[in-house]
């Protein structure tokens, strides 16, 4: 049984996806007069992918990010949620989530891969059975496209929010390469890369990453990335996207050779600079240092199922409805 698939386009872009977690674990961007550059974090073996606790490249669900209070509430109903010990919330679907499952191959060609998963009623604590499909495709011109589809079965509504948790390192340190610096070898720090966001608001968060208020303007503050600038700080932050035709995010390498434009149909973006990557990849090959890459996670705002008043589309799926969203990653290499 194949556990890894490779997709290529006519321009030389190449990606790899694993059955485990429907995980996007490699992306090689063609450059002029140079070998293609690996821009994703990944591991040398499948055992490391299974061992890591950083969701590296994985498809996350049923709910990406956090749900507060260890239960899901709607009206008079409540459903206890699975969670890691010691947390006051469920994170990324909890233990044994979609990121830790072997997905079923539905379709594979040179330019496209489609994987499926059945999530039964009560899975992770969520009501209703959910049939999920994730499609990776390379339509050309440096684009990696991820399409999510989920259909809910049963008598109860359920919030659905899937994302991909790839970590980007556009300077090509994605396979254990190191750069020489004072005092010996060091890893490239993603905080010196340039980021621009199409986000005029951000969600205040507490120390657990849960909402500490309503979305607020970023204008002139530390979270104002509407103009391109160095990341410059640790981030594990939810931004409200402005929408429209402009990218949700633009990331650029330090050497200026690679840029990424991210487009999404989802209403928010979690930006995480990987400041817990070292403990989360302990025992993996390689073990990634903190701040060695950034995750750009299109999704709903944290704890959205309990906040229908927020300025975004409804995250609750009714029985028989289909949840469909698209992330589009356009790489520019030169």
Specify the residue positions occupied by each region the protein language model found.
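An exposed, glycine/acidic-rich loop-and-rim segment of catalytic or binding clefts
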Residues: 1-334
